[in-house]
């Protein structure tokens, strides 16, 4: 039976109003992943379609819809053996909190019920106001009679979508009467709540293990905004080097479920402080919460007598370029990720491009927005009407709404161009197949269909490759592209060993040194040719040995091509 994977990449937008909605979607995605794992716990189509193959009982109170997804997969299993997994997540602000919780649940098959309680019971604004920022009995008393007409005016100006209810009025009054000119909400309390929620996911977990199938990985990226920024080098013609400050930053986490059964995870219990800090930093809305710094999490853990055993690993993975620039990560001040990147679609696409598969994949990129249709053709500061907007509406939209509601047209257009390029490359491969098969037939003398040895296969491969040498217009540029790709990998490897950040002056210098060495050693040349009778790698010319040892991307493409051919059998 045909095997297929449905791989989901999630983009969780920022916005506290989306938080609970996104969390509900995440619970369903978690149950879908649970159902897929349960369906594939047996081998073979007959066993999977057996009447006794049902979703296991007692799988957890929050997994009640998983049985529905299990039955759906079983019904689809009559036609295709479908496996479903979430392997890419990116998020900003409140979306980052939800993305981190979902990634941890997927990586270790944990419950999201504690996160549900976090949103519904612990995320109340009045709880999050810092004790020293709370209004006294007579603090800003004049807002009591003014708030209702003020909100009514804001509604007329288009600043509010609906008329606030009494509960909202009470919370709005508490907020506006709290401390001014300093963040009123308690950042340390938010860190504590996030840490508690992530730790509590271990309680009531469904089962030990992971929802990631063997041989797959899960990648997570959350956006943060570096208040001071970091210098980036730009290599231009004149002047040769420019510098600018980059304030956008991604915090990255990953989990790999190896085929040996081992789980290399950034989402384990010992990583909870790292995850809580990332969530706190990405959700530090300017003006409401104070900026996030590492010292806040250090103080919280010290007060509880806990350790942050993965702190150095977290910093090495996410702040290596800061250290390479002479900056101390402890001094970095982080703001809400939605300030500069509220919809991190390209971060998700970057992961999609490097995730490998062993069977046919149906890829879906999902961005969660409960009002997607309503927003088509509607600007961030518009109610869809006509006429001149109010003064405060314009000010609010310019300073807040418009920067946080940038359209995703460019990102989706880039994805469309990428998909179109893939389709064209596939069509080119299909059209060239007859000529390739004829060339291989001539090189092997028709012996490829019978038994052969590894030595014969090696000889045929060199012979067929060298037959292209009769077309130097194609052959030499092809070899040169392979050599340069291998040299890029070598330069990147040396750069990582030397602690050079990508695109840094040091990395640029290493690249130039490697290419100069390759030209001097005859690795970069005008013409490329390998003798047909070469028996060992050591007898290969220098350029071929470089490709054999460092042409990792070339080898990956070859393996992927073989896997694609096997899946078509």
PLM regions and their residue ranges:
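Small-residue-rich anion-binding loops in enzyme active sites
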Residues: 1-13, 17-27, 31, 35-36, ...
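Extended hydrophobic secondary-structure segments that form protein cores and membrane-embedded regions
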Residues: 8-12, 47, 85-93, 125, ...
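Flexible loop/turn segments at secondary-structure boundaries
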Residues: 17-20, 96-99, 228-232, 340-343, ...
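Patatin-like phospholipase
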Residues: 19-196, 236-245
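Active-site gating loop/helix substructures
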Residues: 166-181, 215-354, 399, 403, ...
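Extended, Lys/Arg-enriched charged tracts that mediate electrostatic binding to polyanionic substrates
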Residues: 185-211, 216-219, 227-230, 341
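Hydrophobic, mid-to-C-terminal alpha-helical segments
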Residues: 358-362, 374
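Charged, amphipathic alpha-helical linkers/stalks
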Residues: 365-368, 375-499
